[in-house]
């Protein structure tokens, strides 16, 4: 089991007269080597679940384990090291470094400027159709091109888990399909978790987690392996 979530609650304004539940009593188990979608209306808690799984949001109560390790038992430095080693992140905003070239931006997670690393980065940019922009700066690219560069950056360290939050929002439909096809290829060696409003990009998903008002209401199973029905709180 790659991720195990038990009795997870995430509460904002905890202790105040009015508390806001972002996540309510979430129980979930996820295996690796899959494409998992998280869907729900705005404010439903889907991004909160993604960031909690990634260790970027600490739960108000409950536990999250990754490869048998509870996040709550890790020091901040060990948590950071784990994310850097095993995780790749793709956010709705690209967060590219303005003064660096696209190629150098892609290389930042691995801090490696060797010929081999540069060739790997260029190969990723080529798969995403923007290799010709490797020497450009972020401001010279369109929004969709910058997002593709951010995707290449997330993949450069061969992560075991790829987290994506509305990653195709700035892409046209064809580009979105190309990106999801590339991410689907990574499921042979990684777990890919994608938050989206667009159900059409999840046509190849193994599971789609549906969230409403902070609770998992259902999981649509495309394929049965790796899905633990007993761990879902409905």
Where are these regions (language model features)?
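ABC ATPase NBD coupling module
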Residues: 20, 71-88, 228
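Helix-to-loop junction immediately C-terminal to a conserved catalytic motif
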Residues: 54
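Conserved ABC transporter NBD signature motif
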Residues: 62-71
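Short coil-to-helix segment of the ABC ATPase nucleotide-binding domain corresponding to the Q-loop/switch region
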Residues: 100-107
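Conserved ABC ATPase signature
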Residues: 137-147
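A short, proline-enriched helix->beta-strand linker immediately N-terminal to the Walker B motif
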Residues: 156-160
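Catalytic Walker B motif of ABC-type/P-loop ATPase nucleotide-binding domains
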Residues: 162-165
